[in-house]
A protein has these predicted regions:
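Amphipathic alpha-helical dimerization/coiled-coil segments
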Residues: 1-7, 25, 80-109
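N-terminal helix-turn-helix DNA-binding core of bacterial DNA-binding proteins
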Residues: 2, 6-46, 66-80, 84
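Short, hydrophobic-biased segments on the C-terminal half of alpha helices
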Residues: 52-53
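Glycine-centered, phosphate/nucleic-acid-interacting loop/turn motifs that mediate DNA/RNA or nucleotide
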Residues: 59
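Short beta-strand "wing" residues that participate in macromolecule-binding interfaces
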Residues: 63
Length: 109
């Protein structure tokens, strides 16, 4: 089992590419075959397959084979490490922003 930091890094790396983010966003609306994604994004089939492999390696998507086609869909649990990371820092920043607001109010008096 990989560490939380390793999982976060894989997700950040996978979503750093605009094409992969667009593919991931498209898959949030439903399952799609590689050929459908190729047509939708005007990207070569090998490039789409490579992007999907990266997303799959990060745990963000899963694929199922049906005949010669592979259909991909979002893995809902795949984004959890990123959600946990954001939640941790959200608490940190909320606390610090609140302190800053209090300081600014004191300075205005």
């Amino acid at each position: 089992m990989q560490s939380a930091a390793a999982a976060e890094n894989k997700i950040f790396q996978a979503l750093a590419d605009p094409s992969r983010r667009a593919i991931f966003e498209s898959l949030t609306r439903g399952e799609a075959a590689v050929k459908d994604l190729t047509a939708r994004f005007d990207i070569s089939q090998p490039a789409v397959s490579q992007h999907l492999a990266t997303l799959k390696d990060a745990g963000l998507v899963n694929g199922r084979r049906e005949g010669r086609c592979v259909y991909y869909r979002v893995e809902p649990r795949g984004i959890k490490p990123l959600i946990d990371w954001i939640a941790h820092y959200r608490a940190f920043w909320t606390e610090h922003v609140d302190r800053l607001e209090q300081l600014l109010e004191k300075m205005d008096r």
